[in-house]
């Protein structure tokens, strides 16, 4: 489903994840796990890091793309956009900002471009795209769309409430606009 519109999409979005499935029954594959994927592969194969350490570093870097401090967060594959935790709210904010008003094809292209950009150094250097995401977030916030998005996710019936995600959306666009903490 599309978090922004609340509707099912007509196209498939293929996402990847790397996780240890030995001690788990559920893996939530999401935009974070997808963006971590190439970075984790690079850190493990080229920098000879252990998978667990590579995943932790990649998760911190991916959340850092939008200025979110994920130091104490659970693994990305444990997060759920319908969950109740603060970190679940960060996932929801991250997902909807990347989704924006993009088609599945445009979202796929964006995700691939970001994953390719950050694969070797963990950074995303495309300032124009960062600003376009910030502009979408600012417009959505000022137009009251964040409330509509909350209602979309709640209407799916996956949980009784939707965790607060708006602070992450606002923090990102405030930062990109040079407003600091408002």
How should these model regions be labeled?
Residues 1-182:
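Feature for extracytoplasmic/surface-facing segments of secreted or surface-associated proteins
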